[in-house]
Amino acid sequence: MTEAMDDVSCGSRYSIIEEDLVVLGESFGLGEIQACHFLPNGLMNGNWRLETPEGAFALKRIMDVPLPLARRDLAVLAELADAGVPVGRPMATSSGQTVAEVAGRDYCLIPWLEGGHRPGTELTLDQAADLGVLLGQIHRNLNDERTARLLPPASELLAAPVTTPHAARTDADRFLALIAALESPTAFDTEAAQALGERKVLLDKYAHFRPGTAVAAGPVGWTHGDVQHRNVLWRDGEIVGVLDWDRIRVRPFGEEVARTATVQFGGEDGFLELERTSAFVAGYRSVVPIPVPALADAVERLWWKRMSGYWQLVFHYDRDDHSCDHLFLPAERFLAWWTERREMVQEAFAAMP
């Protein structure tokens, strides 16, 4: 390498990869790797930007997905690129593989896409609609004949287990007990305990609104799994790239619409920007005419999932992984805001093109 590497470690989950770079450069035909920059925004995998004589590339160490699924997802990505979806086409090694293994560590490589991430409140209404159109196009392309050999047609019925209020309270009490047993609680521990107490109050007040069936409304099909501002690149007002394709799964389309909107236009700000949400939903419906009741079902299920789940605390206390700590308190504020305005939120998701 001709330039010193930036710090490429990030806690215990990422190894220093300098020893792997020579092999990766040879495998992918990159020549000498001139610089390697760690990208801290990825929450689940290791990501780096490589500068080489062949150009700039995004290198991902595959850590959060089984290798067979990663290979399938990379093959799907190539098909989507052929269909005109704004994605990077995976690079192949000298042996024709999209995954390179080095000392038991698996990597994939994609040409670097120039662009920036834009939180939802930075988007104009037209851009919010464009994002909805793109999500609709992704759903159409993931479920057409081009990808059928990789992603077999999905069933119209999909089980959607609903956490009981009792189970949600039990989980809250478990985390409260863990915090109470700490010898030296941190500021995060103190704030988490307060938030858990407030969550239990919400559970007591709104438990009777939990979804009554364990089957989600259709249509269902193959979905991206994490379309939101961290995984969408913009340049000159246009979407130029969709990233992070390692969560392709069969889900209700409405589930991904609801999740994308609440992460893109809310969540970290403590409220949902309803006008942009409506524009996004109308854009999506211009491509995929999902019925209003189906999307309403998805929105209610997502609300209850947030009400009854504590995934950031699972990471923090059960896995000793603090990488998502910063998401917990904003999510709690958003949940309280959403719970008090459930009808307004549903109206936003009923928008038509």
Regions found by a protein language model. Name each.
Residues T2-A35:
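Juxta-kinase regulatory segment immediately upstream of eukaryotic protein kinase catalytic domains
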Residues E3, S9, D173-L178, S286, ...:
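ATP/Mg2+ or Mg2+-diphosphate-binding catalytic cores
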Residues I16-E26, T147, D173-H224, A351:
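An alpha-helical support segment within catalytic cores of ATP-dependent transferases
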Residues F28-T52:
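ATP-binding glycine-rich phosphate-binding loop
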Residues L43-P53, A58-L59, P90, D204-E255:
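Active-site acidic catalytic loop and adjacent metal/ATP-binding pocket
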Residues L125-A195:
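A cross-family kinase active-site recognition segment
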Residues G254-P289, W304-H322:
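Active-site activation/catalytic loop segments of kinase-like enzymes and analogous catalytic loops
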